[in-house]
Amino acid sequence: MQHSQLSPNARQQLAETVILNKARLGLSWQDLADGTGLALTFVTAALLGQHALPEAAARKVAGQLGLDDDAVLLLQTIPLRGSIPGGIPTDPTIYRFYEMLQVYGSTLKALVHEQFGDGIISAINFKLDIQKVEDPEGGSRAVITLDGKYLPTKPF
């Protein structure tokens, strides 16, 4: 049976423990995701308190991180999602995504509606990927893929 969280507190506290143990043990997010059968981005989001993990994946990552059975159970609970408090984000990396949506949000909306019609792109039936690629002009570039199912608005 699935269980859900009433507040984000328990999962946030567990996320703090995950981050501390990950650093102590010298593990990467990829190390933790390997062998779960799940995407790196999904496992990372789950360990940061934004998704529930299937039992086998929860047991695997908990074992790697030295977490107890209560943590295994907590990793399987449906969280109260949303890791950014209200208002404009202050973390520079997160703010850049906010800025991107400020600049390109209306463009994305216009193009989605023109190509698909009235509706939304799901963040539930969704895949996220990030790749580091070399920039021909020097340095690196981040290629971020947001892959969500289109859900049309249904008149009623």
From Swiss-Prot:
The active site is at residues 96, 99, 122. It holds the Pfam family CYNS_N. Keywords: Lyase. Catalyzes the reaction of cyanate with bicarbonate to produce ammonia and carbon dioxide. Signal peptide: none annotated. Its EC number is 4.2.1.104. Belongs to the cyanase family. It catalyses: cyanate + hydrogencarbonate + 3 H(+) = NH4(+) + 2 CO2. This is Cyanate hydratase. It comes from Pseudomonas paraeruginosa (strain DSM 24068 / PA7) (Pseudomonas aeruginosa (strain PA7)). GO terms for molecular function: cyanate hydratase activity; DNA binding. NCBIfam families: cynS, PRK02866.1. InterPro entries: Cyanase, Cyanate_lyase_C, Cyanate_lyase_C_sf, CYNS_N, Lambda_DNA-bd_dom_sf. GO terms for biological process: cyanate metabolic process. The keyword Lyase applies.
